[in-house]
Amino acid sequence: MPDALQIIVADDHPLFRDAIVLALQASLPGCRTLEASSFSTLEAMVREQDTLDLVLLDLSMPGANGFSSLVFLRGERPEVPVVVISSNDHPRTIRRAQQFGAAGFVPKSSPVAVIREAVQAVMDGGAWFPAQKAERSEEDAQLAARLAQLTPQQFRVLMCMADGLLNKQIAHELGLAENTVKVHVTAILRKLECHSRTQAAVLVKALQAEGGDDAATLPE
C-alpha cells in the first residue's frame, strides 16, 4: 500500500488553513496534512520531514519577506512542488511566483473547486496558473538565478543580513561560529554579484510582492 501523501499548508490564518485542509482531504483522501503558521515553523517542518509531496504557501506569513519563503523552499527541497495561495493576485506577483519556482498560483478568492483543480494538476506533474499573467521579467529571472546559487544555509544568512544583523548576531541566531558566518557572507556577496551587505539587502527587498498585504479569504 503506498504511503499517504504528505502536504504542508503554510498560512497564518487558522480558519483558512482549516478550509484548505478540508478541501485537500476531500480531493486527496488519506493525505496527511501538516500546518505551519509562520516561516520559522515551516522551516522546521521542511527540515524534519523526510518525505514531502506538496507545500501550499501563503506569501505573507510572519517571518517571511515577500517571496523569501518560496525561494527558501525551492533551495531546500527543489523536488517538492509549491503552490502559492495568496490574496495578492496582482499579475506581476503571479508571474514572479512562477519565475521564482512555484508550480502553481491560486488566488485566495478562488472557490474550493479551483483550489482542488490546481492541486490535482500539480500533483499530476503539471502546473496551474491563472490565465492572465504579466510579461516575463528578465530582471526577476536574473535575480532568481542568482538566489538559486545559494545553499539553504547561505540563504538563511542572507535573510539575517537583510534584517541588519551583524556577523556576531547572525552566528548567535543560527547557531554558527562567527568565522563560518564570515565565510558565508563572502560567498553570498560573490554569488549575488554584490560589493556590499547593503547591496545584498537591496536585492532581498526586490523579493517583495506587488500590491498590499495578504488577508484571509475563505474559499467558497
Residue spans for each PLM region:
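Acidic catalytic/metal-coordinating carboxylates
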Residues: S37-S38, P62-S68
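Short, flexible helix-to-coil linker/hinge segments that flank and couple to helix-turn-helix
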Residues: I94-Q99, G104-P152, R156, A206-A209
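Short amphipathic alpha-helix used as the core "switch/output" element in two-component signaling
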Residues: F67-E79, L203
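Acidic, metal-coordinating helix/loop segments flanking the phosphotransfer/catalytic sites
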Residues: E35-L54
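Active-site residues of response regulator receiver
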Residues: D58-L59, S86
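Conserved acidic segment of CheY-like receiver
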Residues: D3-F16, I20-L24, F39, V55, ...
